[in-house]
């Protein structure tokens, strides 16, 4: 086992050859590299699969042995300072490694088809592989310096992937917004790291915890300064995990391709903030007020994310706010000290949300055959509806992910979210009420998304629910100028062909994005060469990852279900996390009161079903039709109370749709204030600073010109003026200095 751990340092570097070789190939052999571009997708999946197998093996070793492993190389700069680089393999590392690799592999397979039409196909896979390297380096880091280096690389990859379609101004603005917002948190993280190094003299996690605990027990630290440093460290996690008030970048990050949303903004990168807080939890636990601050930020984010998701029309933005809310649950659990519950929900949410994002990508992919490449239309739930009969496999898996996120048993998120809800009662009744109420809101907005997307009729063909026909479907090309071609091909395979990884037939890249190229796994067995008036199911290459993630959503919750082992109720996750739990809680309790669990489960499921019922009542097609014909309104007495109720509903809708006006506030006061300050500084620099220097030059020039004209060019005049000046100076000197 020791030899296995010794080779763990290679984990982050296994996916690195892909971006390096793609970059070198595009520089040295651009034509050949583009011709064999499918090869890079296969290599990306293969290398990440190797990392996944290695990570699973390490996890099995840890479950059996309950141990840590750390290896450090020291770079001694002088006698007083040295930099240590190494890797740490513990339960938290192995959990994150498995999450990154399993979700990453599914996303890469999915992306081969989803991005097949895109001219930036190679660039996409280079970015994704480099992101995997950065994220794996982050979770295996043994000290704060390495964490910060890979933290910044992850931020760079996020910037590149959000702005992948940088020719679109909206995407360019979104990546800049994400970059700047994260820089605020990263600056705080850097200051916090330097502050704790100044206190303890070490960047290594285990040394840092031990030294700080000794200093704290002897009252040798300034707790006000320590609290400030801890808040600065936490600021980095707040920005990366889209917690209030640095959450504003996450919805705009949906401007990137949908596979990016599934990997980075659902399962891995936004979980980096949760990972950092979990890694530093032994430090935060001994600092006054910081744990309470973490829980307060978490509960605010839980409620804010859920309320902002209520009125979103863009399917990806709705899922983004859902992600923000669920990350708030994890942060709340960490603030309460529920280490196991937070990581359990991190695991279950990652698979469920990745399933939902890939499902939304399949929906968007099918809608583009009707509305063309226009994110404002293909992602608009108001133009969807009735997709259940057109994309049945996507509908089933999307429903599975929706039910999981709602907390319906026996799906994954039910087990993890219930633990957080139960722990919240023991921590604070106010926090518990908010958390339980938000569970109902989660069920409401998730089923709102599901019903608007899959139930009823395809709204792109109708102006309203009454059935009035609209104009023909849109025709918008990839670049927004030319219309789509009349033929939109699915994958084809003759009877005498077999399934293989690489296609023998070359398909050129169509510039307006509707003629798809074949993916490296071709399983389809039919051919259509017609214009689509309705959406169609995605190719099997996209459905396979969705199906696998659906299986994870069904069964991954079982790792947290206790089983009886030698008279003790123990689950796989608790055994896996035993070393970390013992580090935080010297006396951990593995027993479980099933009666208490069932009572709380009945309450949480009842709240979830109430949210589902409310969403069905408001967004089910039959209600929309009745409301359209004023049948429901005829039973409601119109009066002051009804008018007041309508105003309240409209106010809540506007507040939610406009993102609680937080973005507008930041735009006016921060962005506008900084721009105003920049304009004032520019004015002061040009008019005052430059005016002073230019004024001295102008005055000197005028005086010189005046003297030049007075002189006239005659030597006798120069001598006369010289003698006159000398006489005046002598007279002044005599009158003032010699007299007094």
Swiss-Prot record:
- InterPro entries from the UniProt entry: NADH_UbQ_OxRdtase_chlpt_su5_C (IPR002128), NADHpl_OxRdtase_5_subgr (IPR018393), ND/Mrp_TM (IPR001750), NU5C-like (IPR003945), Proton_antipo_N (IPR001516)
Q: What class of enzyme is it?
A: translocase
UniProt GO BP: ATP synthesis coupled electron transport; electron transport coupled proton transport
Q: Per UniProt, what is the membrane topology?
A: Multi-pass membrane protein
Q: Does the keyword Cell division apply?
A: no
One of the record's GO molecular function terms: quinone binding
Subcellular localization(s) per the UniProt record = Plastid, Chloroplast thylakoid membrane
What does the entry list under GO cellular component?
chloroplast thylakoid membrane
Key words, A-Z: Chloroplast, Membrane, NAD, NADP, Plastid, Plastoquinone, Quinone, Thylakoid, Translocase, Transmembrane, Transmembrane helix, Transport
Determine if Transferase is one of this entry's keywords: no
- Superkingdom: Eukaryota
The EC number(s) given in the record are: 7.1.1.-
User: What is one Pfam family matched by this protein?
Assistant: Proton_antipo_C
What residues form the membrane-spanning segments? 9-29, 40-60, 89-109, 125-145, 147-167, 185-205, 219-239, 258-278, 286-306, 327-347, 354-374, 396-416, 425-445, 543-563, 602-622, 718-738
Reactions it catalyzes: a plastoquinone + NADH + (n+1) H(+)(in) = a plastoquinol + NAD(+) + n H(+)(out); a plastoquinone + NADPH + (n+1) H(+)(in) = a plastoquinol + NADP(+) + n H(+)(out)
Concerning NCBIfam families, the annotation shows:
NDH_I_L, PRK06590.1
User: What does the subunit comment say?
Assistant: NDH is composed of at least 16 different subunits, 5 of which are encoded in the nucleus.
Q: What does this protein do?
A: NDH shuttles electrons from NAD(P)H:plastoquinone, via FMN and iron-sulfur (Fe-S) centers, to quinones in the photosynthetic chain and possibly in a chloroplast respiratory chain. The immediate electron acceptor for the enzyme in this species is believed to be plastoquinone. Couples the redox reaction to proton translocation, and thus conserves the redox energy in a proton gradient.
Q: Record's family?
A: Belongs to the complex I subunit 5 family.
Name of the molecule in the record = NAD(P)H-quinone oxidoreductase subunit 5, chloroplastic
Q: What organism, scientifically named, is this protein from?
A: Atropa belladonna
